[in-house]
Design a protein with these regions (language model features):
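Alpha-helical transmembrane segments and their immediate juxtamembrane cytosolic regions
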Residues: 1-363
Length: 363
């Protein structure tokens, strides 16, 4: 989760300010989508609930894509000026996200916490921060194409011995690492694809109108095309009879960890990013709550887990209850973000991500 480079409505160059506000808005949308999906319910196939579940398997990919962009922007100066990378800050961030994610997983919210995979994605990406753009695209493509078959192969070799359980602080270190890399709900071998693609996007001129148009068109094509290709391939080669069948590679089901879902979901994320970059109204006061929610994305994410664990669970039982709980949670977190940003430039947990600097306390 990165909000590095976040700016206020004043005092920034016009193009740079628009880019950062658009990223904040996209991050805010990702937070809202994850709140809706994590709140639930997810048991009915009525048209209304299917519409409510549109963010399922998409909001989290948008979150990860934006995380890669944020890391790219955070290290941009070091890359362009051939200066040392901010190793202390990056490692501090990894440690906090890992420990915080493991601690949050112990709460009774019924959510697979995503922060642990962020920590290892940052570590995984450190050798790539100075790599060429082409190398980033190759790594992202390899993760999307080779990660899912490897995921199936490991299951087959272990007789399907892992069930994607969330990783918590009570697990052994080996189980934690194995869970994050391959056996957990967000296997790094698959989820590296959108994160590294975000690293590449962060190097592009996101302020260019032509780029935002391409993101919209190519994102929509990937989102729809991969989704439509799935039933065609299933009709040609048959339905998988188990999670270990190679036909599973044709699945576009959300969080299946398969290529077509990954391409479709990442395409949706790219489309949403392109739309946010295309809009030029982010400085209007009416959208400030969404912007501030995106700037306090980590705080909002942690906050919604606490609300789920302390207030919402074991509900909701119906779609109406889920919509009410989601709307109330989003409203409360947006209000908090708005009030907090009147006084402070960073959210409470965003501020913790900054590595302690002994020079600040010495004279």
């Amino acid at each position: 989760v990165s909000t590095e480079g976040t700016v206020s409505f004043e005092g920034a160059p016009r193009t740079g300010r628009h880019r950062m506000l658009a990223l904040d808005a996209a991050r805010g949308l990702a937070v809202i989508g994850m709140i809706a999906i994590n709140t639930g319910p997810r048991g009915d196939d009525s048209p209304l609930e299917l519409f409510y579940r549109v963010p399922y398997g998409r909001a989290s990919l948008l979150f990860v894509l934006l995380g890669g962009i944020g890391l790219s922007l955070m290290t941009r100066r070091s890359r362009l000026q051939q200066a040392p990378l901010p190793w202390a800050g990056l490692l501090w961030r990894c440690a906090l996200l890992m420990l915080g994610g493991l601690a949050l997983q112990s709460l009774d919210h019924g959510v697979s916490v995503i922060l642990q995979i962020y920590a290892l994605l940052i570590l995984f990406s450190l050798p790539l921060l100075r790599a060429s753009g082409r190398s980033l695209l190759v790594v992202s493509g390899l993760s999307a194409v080779a990660g899912p078959p490897l995921w199936i192969l490991v299951q087959a070799q272990t007789d399907g011995g892992f069930d994607r359980d969330p990783i918590s602080a009570t697990d052994q270190i080996g189980e934690i690492l194995t869970g994050i890399v391959i056996t957990g709900p967000y296997p790094l071998i698959v989820w590296a694809a959108p994160f590294v693609f975000g690293l590449w996007l962060g190097r592009q001129k996101l302020t260019e109108t032509r780029l935002s148009t391409r993101l919209i068109l190519w994102g929509a094509a990937a989102a729809v095309g991969a989704r439509l290709l799935s039933p065609v391939l299933v009709a040609m080669f048959g339905e998988p009879t188990s999670h270990l069948d190679w036909q599973r590679l044709f699945s576009a089901v959300a969080h299946s960890q398969m290529p077509l879902w990954l391409i479709s979901g990442t395409g949706s994320a790219v489309f949403a990013l392109g739309v946010c970059l295309k809009i030029h109204a982010w400085t209007r006061p009416g959208v400030a709550p969404l912007i501030f929610l995106g700037q306090l994305a980590l705080t909002a994410y942690i906050g919604h887990l606490l609300i789920l664990a302390l207030i919402v669970r074991p509900g909701p039982d119906t779609l109406a209850q889920g919509v009410l709980a989601t709307a109330s949670t989003v409203a409360a977190l947006a209000l908090f973000a708005w009030l907090w940003r009147q006084r402070f430039s960073r959210g409470p947990f965003e501020a913790l991500l900054r590595a302690p600097n002994p020079r600040r306390t010495t004279r």
